[in-house]
Amino acid sequence: MDRISSAAEQALAPQVALAAAPATGPLHKLIKVAVSCVPWLIIGGLLWAGLFIKPQPVGGTVQPPVIERRDHFFGLAAAPAGGIWVAGSSGKIVSIGADGRIERMSTPTDQTLQDIAVWDAQRAVAVGNDGVVLTTADGGKRWTKVDGIPRSEVANKLTRVRVATGGRAVATGEMGALLQSTDFGATWSRLRDEEDVAWNDAALLAEGQVVAVGEFGRILRSTDGGASWQEPASGVESSLMAVAFRNANEGVAVGLEGVVLVSRDGGASWQRAESGAQAHLFDIAWDEANQRWLGAGALGSWVTAAADAAGWRAGRVDERDLAWHTRVLPAGKDAWFAGANIGRWDGQRWAALAGH
């Protein structure tokens, strides 16, 4: 037994000695070099991937909706082909077709647009913050920014634009801005010198008559296209926000604190009417189809009266909707409202557009 163990130990001794001997051969050196290079190979591979491999998107690109919840739309006009155009935040002009299709037009500005008006099937104009004026001559396919707009060194927001036949337009705004164009918005000039008052709206009547309303209850009237002006008393100190006429004589102006003024002599004199509204009123329109006046304002407010502008009634488009509206546009039996949201009201039911 001892001899067997001894023989086994002798047989294993060379192998143990071989295993215990230090590995200093060429193969071992090659292995060490290869192992030491592994981290650098990994780092190099990551750098190459970062520089030269471009990740590919999976699935389609998510496009934001045309009308987003954060959008406000201050201007509203009947579109040439039916439906409406609205103008507002970030230079947006949006077409809402009679079939409900909603499309954003391409515009060359990010300035908020305050109003939009349409002459005919091809030509329209929009105005807004910092004196921006845009025009189109192809039905809204392309909008062009107009240069050379008269500017103030203080403030230049244009809040409203009204148009009339023959390419005439008047834009109102801060620092006494009353600007006129007679060539479909291509060029503009001042109707009055700059002053520290905001004119909020103007009505263009026949034969060169202009009636403008603004801050502090001020009213201006011209019968010669702006060559000379009269300032009839309004009897109120609240800022007047909008004015409209249904013919050469009968007009209505509305303003803050529910103010409603009525004129029956082309704006030469004004009388206050009891509107029944407590909220601010921002717009007034004559609804020819329904032979009524219709106004819009804060907290979803509306006011209305018959053609004689007497017996005013007030209410809200929806008790659950407290959005303010700066524009109202009669449309058949219904009316469009635009402001903090856009919606259609039939006198009973309010339907806000998706996204608002």
Which stretches of residues belong to each language-model region?
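Residue-level hotspots at or immediately adjacent to binding/recognition sites across diverse folds
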Residues: D2-H356
